Structure formats: structure tokens, C-alpha cells
Amino acid sequence: ARALSRIADPAALELLKKSLADEDAEVVAWSAYGLGYGCKGNEAATVRALVGRAATLSVTKIDRSGPLDWGASFADALGRCGNAEAEATLRAWLDIDDKSEAAALALGRMASRRKRLDDASIVALLDAASRPDKPVASALLAFTRIDAGSDMIKARLFNVANDALSDSAGARRSFAVRALGRVGDAAVPALSKVLREPSFTVTERSDAARELARIGEAGQVELRKSLAAFVPKPETRATLKGAELAPLRVVLDSLALPIRDAKPALDEIASIELPKGDPAFARRLIGLRCRAASLLAGEGITQPKLVACDPDPEGVAGRLALLEVLARGKLTGTRFTRFKELVESKAPLVRQAALEQLGSHPEVAEPESILAKALRAPDAGTVATAAQVIASYPDRAAERRTRTTATEAVDGSTPAPEPIKPHASIVDALTTAFTLQRAPDSTEVWTALTDAAGALQILSFKPKLDAFCKSPNPALRQHAEKALRVMGEQKRECKAEGPAPRPSELDHLVSDKVTLVFETDSGEVKLSLDPALAPVAVTRFVDLARSGFFEKVRVHRVVPGFVVQLGDPGGDGYGGAGKAPLACETSPISFDPLSVGVALAGRDTGSSQLFVTLAAFPHLDGDYALIGRAEPGWERIAQGDVVQRVRVLPP
């Protein structure tokens, strides 16, 4: 049932319907999970099968011992199907003690996917979240993913979430903080309290800053007021070597112009003295200095603190801050000259960030020349970024770009846009990009190039897209199908014509749990990988750790309060170990705080990047392979930290 649930094709789904009747709880759980994963297009029949089997399980004695909760698997499957009957069933389960928590989680995931819930479900979730005897901890999850709606619902959500702030740290309190931003101005005092009080966790305080930013101007007023409390004094500055960096960084990132009364605090932060002999700590402080300087500068690219924030003239933090400032105005004249330097930078992170600005700056001269050069870049991330820009803004790659604002025809109607004629340099660069040999785990580059070819409707690339359409990789097939339909084959359906290559890891699968100890710039952190969850992926990461792959690799992504991610030698998130992509060994097990997962750029695209969640994020459940659990301490890690050494236990 586990294997069938991960295949989830029509033949597998028929077998899963049969195994749903099994008497083994684990088989039933995997069967329900697989049916939910393959529910699209067959929602009504699948929901009926799930609801019927759940009803019989409720009155029969089935052994519930084991690693999986069949009730949670059924709820998750119904949430994935997401039709009216599924939602009504989950709503009813909120009133059943042994199903309420799973039902709330499933409704939260449904809200994340659909961006809405029925009014009856919203009321039922608020009822469940506010039960005086035993509130359902996950009932507020849905409100972290959708807007609250009417003023009456907002008022009730505020009362429920505000009450939850008095709980001890846990899922209910965490979801309450994230839900308060949907309430609006009335939530500002409560969020301010969370942000300022050290009794709340670093994750909750970081979330509070983000939710204040979501609220708008009232939230910005509070962020500006709060900033002064976060300015590190010389005697307490060392706390920024650890987790206390996160709330300050999120406050800075959440602030928007104009800065008004935040200027004195920003001046202090932009002027923090850098330590000598501690480059890792200095890097953290440079990031703070440059973000503060960017806010102080507004549109002024010669602002003294902006110029001085990064002592390395080629430093990434300083150049990214300059790019932020440049992007606030038109990229013409001197500003364009500086932009051109950044968009041709040898630092991939800087170059990619500059390329992304082309979409919002139609005034940039000759964008097709910039994009063509980027498509020929030596690093995969820059190639993929350029292709993604073309896919989203195909006129930037055209011989003659269409006007950004349509003019009315004589009869008052809006004329259809002119067909885009790709610039010859773009066609040449894409041709080269498509013909290069790339590492087996370069799926993200291939899908980006496919999207670009489709957006520009370059018919000469159809043979390449036809090949992708038959690929065993589902991400390649999905993007190829979309591109081919844009090119005129509206009914094209892509199907694999052969199996994926056999993973080499199958020849030496890890059989027992393994602990990885990462020695980083921010200290030692640990995680435990469990092959029972995802045997092939766990074996891959253990092999990489033993080979020394992770040593000297930077932590390329940190979202405070959300995730820490590493495993790309290039440091921009586009690279891997050069091995065949991993099939998604997903499961019904939840991403709780300190869960370890395989990073993806689409189904079956994992390679060597892993992430650690810093709080509960159930919307990840079932879409990412969960491969283990981490020990506390990962909240200390900062973006840019280097893994100096990795130990594997047992050796």
C-alpha cells in the first residue's frame, strides 16, 4: 500500500480502493493517503469510498498501534479531495473527540490549497478552537492561510486567538499568532505584545512581526515603534550570535517606507561596529547594517550608510541592499549603469536578484540582451532565473515589446496584444541552453527553460518538449504539457513512456536511524534520519554526509520561524549533488517543529537539499518527504553560516 500510494496512477488507485478494506491499520492508513493523493478528477467516488470505510472502522475493533494514525490519513485524504461532501464530513468530525484534531488539520490544509472554506466550516472551526474544556489545538490553522471574511468573523477570531496567547507554547498558540494578522488593526496591540515579550518563543515573535506587516499601516506604525527595543546595546550584542537575531531581522525585513520615526533606530543599526576576528558574527551584523541602510536610503544610491554597510566592495549583502534601493526608482541614467553592474555580477545571488527586477522595470533598455547573456551563464541558477523571467514577462525577450498599457480601438474595445516575436539573441541563447549537457538533478533548469519556450511559442523547441512530455519525471511532464498547449496543442496530455532510473541507493539501503552532527559557524546542531519514513532519501543523505559533501557548504536559506535549508554547493538553492533526482517518498506524517524534509522544486526533484522546520507547518504534509527529526538548536542558524564538518553516528 505504501508503494501504491506513491505511484497513485489509475491502476494503483484501483488497488488502493481494495486495500482500504484491509484489517491492518497501517495498510488502511497508507491506502487512504494514496487515494487522497490521486483524488483529482475522481473526487466524488473517492470521497464516498473514504467516508464509507471510515464509518465501518468507527464501529469495528482494529488495532491502532503502529507509526501511522489511520484516522489522520482519512482526514488528510478528504482534505485533498476537497469537494463539498469531503468538507462537510470533516466539519462533522470536528465534534468527534478522536477525529477532531485530524479534521481541523485537514480543513487547514484544504484552506491552504483552495484559499477558502465554506462559512459553515469557518464557524465550526472557531467553535472547536474556543471549547472551554478542550479546545482543538489545530482549529486555528485554517485562519493562518485564508482571510477571515466579515467583521463579525474577524471579531470572533480575534477573541479566540487572543485567548490562545495565554496558553503555554505549542501549536495552538503558534497558530493563534499567525492568525491574528488576518484580523486587521484590532490585532495590533496583541501582536505587539508577542513581538516585545521574551516569554514568547523566537518563532512566535518573528511571526508577530510578519503579521504586523500584513495588517498594513497600523502594523507599520507599531513596527517602527518596536524597532528601538531591538537595537542591540554593546553589552548585549553577543546575543545576536544566536536565535535573538531572528526577531530583529524580521522586523527590519517587515518595515516599509517611509521610515518616519524609525530613523534613529535604523541609524544605530546601520552603524553597528563590526567585530574583529569573528567573520561569521560580522556577516550577521553586516546583513543587519545593510538592511537598515537600505531603508534609510530610500531611493538614494549614494547614501553614506548604504555605501559603507558592507566593508567588502564585492560583498553580497551590500550589493543586494544597493539593488533594493535601485529598484525603488526608475532604472535609467546612472541608476541603470549601477543596475547593469549588478545584473552582470559574478555572484549568482546578486545577478539572479537583479534579473528578477526586469519584470517590474519595463524602462530597462535592451532587456533581451541582458537575458540572453544570463541564459549563457555558467551557473544553473542564473540560467533558470533568466528563463523564469522570460516565462513571466515574454515581452522582455521580444524583438519589439508590446506596450505595457493597452490602448482602445476605434470601437472602444481593447485590442488583442500583438503576437510576441522573440529576439534572435534569445532564440540563440535558449537553443544553446537546451542543447547543453546538465547534471541529472537539473530538473528546475529544464522546467524553467520549458516555460520560457512555451511563453515565447518557439516551435523549433517542440521536439525537446515532446521528449520531456514522455519523461518519467512528473515535473518535466507537467511543464512540457503546459508549454505544448500554449503552442497550440490544447488537448495534449503528457504520459511517461518508461520507468524512472533505478536508484543506486537501493543496493545499500540504510536500515537503522542515523544521526548527523553538523558543526557550523553557529555551533553544533543535530538531526536524526529515519529510514522507516523514506529509505531511499535517507540513504542518499547519509551517503552524502559520509562522503564529506556538506562540508564547506553554506546554509543558503533561512526564514526565521519557518525553515533552515542547506545542501546546495553553489549557495543559491538551484544546485545539488549531481545525482538522479529522488522520487518523493511522502507520507501522512505531519511536519511538526524540528521536522526534517527533502527540499523540492516540483514532484520528484529532490537531490541533496534538506530543510528543518522551526515550527509546525501542516501545509507541507504529504507534499514533501519527511525523513527525520532535528534536535533543538537549529533556530540559532543564520543564512550564510558554513558547515565546517559533519559527523555520522554511528560511524
Region locations from a protein language model:
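Cyclophilin-like peptidyl-prolyl cis-trans isomerases
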Residues: 404, 410-428, 432-651
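Short, intrinsically disordered, charge-balanced linker/junction segments flanking boundaries
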Residues: 1-3, 127-128, 628-629, 635-636
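Structural detector for internal amphipathic alpha-helices that build alpha-solenoid repeat scaffolds
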Residues: 1-9, 15-18, 28-41, 60-83, ...
